[in-house]
């Protein structure tokens, strides 16, 4: 699911509600399949990430395991190693996180999010500020996690073209209007035609 829409339409607020960081004004948040809030893998916006702390890549990645217990078990270490290998950062595990490129930092943070979950990833603008090549690589990695590992991915993005290319469902949040449906249906919707240049049918 890719969430798109105007600034201030509530996209990030929705994610914070799913994470339990804010309390809904009305209603409640329910998780299916026995999922616990602490078992959600979260990748925040890059502007929300502290880049100047002196932690190694290994320390950043393994911090994603902390929701499962206060101490790193052998299984947690193995999970962290596997996720670092999956993100192609195993060879830089001892490097300082703050010295990494933007793309490497996002891969490390995605590995951390994978350590926290086996089923649901919440990604808030995961490619913001990255160059086009790194952006495409990261989108392919995210698509692989959904396709090959069966992870449910909920991603906020301002990149409508990427949403149409990679998402199974699109949620468009706007002031006074919303859309939820397939990319093809979105292209034909009023919001889709406004934001994505869709074409109406006769």
Q: What would you call each of these model-derived segments?
A:
Residues 19:
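Helix-to-loop junction immediately C-terminal to a conserved catalytic motif
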Residues 24-38:
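Conserved ABC transporter NBD signature motif
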Residues 75-92:
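Conserved ABC ATPase "signature" region
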Residues 96-100, 104:
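Conserved ABC ATPase signature
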Residues 170-183:
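H-loop (His-switch) and adjacent beta-strand-loop-beta switch element
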């Amino acid at each position: 699911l890719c969430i798109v829409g105007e600034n201030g339409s509530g996209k990030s607020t929705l994610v914070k509600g799913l994470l339990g960081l804010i309390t809904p004004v009305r209603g409640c948040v329910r998780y299916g399949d026995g999922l616990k809030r602490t078992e959600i893998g979260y990748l925040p916006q890059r502007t929300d990430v502290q880049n100047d702390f002196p932690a190694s890549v290994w320390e950043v990645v393994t911090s994603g395991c902390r929701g499962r217990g206060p101490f790193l078990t052998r299984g947690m270490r193995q999970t962290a190693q596997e996720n670092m290998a999956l993100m192609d950062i195993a060879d830089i595990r001892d490097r300082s996180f703050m010295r990494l490129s933007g793309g490497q930092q996002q891969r490390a943070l995605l590995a951390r999010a994978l350590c926290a979950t086996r089923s649901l990833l919440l990604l808030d603008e995961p490619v913001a500020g990255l160059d086009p090549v790194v952006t495409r690589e990261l989108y392919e990695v995210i698509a692989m996690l959904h396709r090959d590992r069966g992870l449910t991915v909920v991603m906020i993005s301002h990149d409508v073209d990427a949403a149409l290319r990679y998402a199974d469902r699109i949620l468009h949040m706007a002031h006074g209007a919303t859309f939820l449906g397939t990319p093809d249906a979105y292209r034909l919707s009023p919001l889709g035609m406004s934001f994505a240049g869709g074409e109406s049918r006769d």
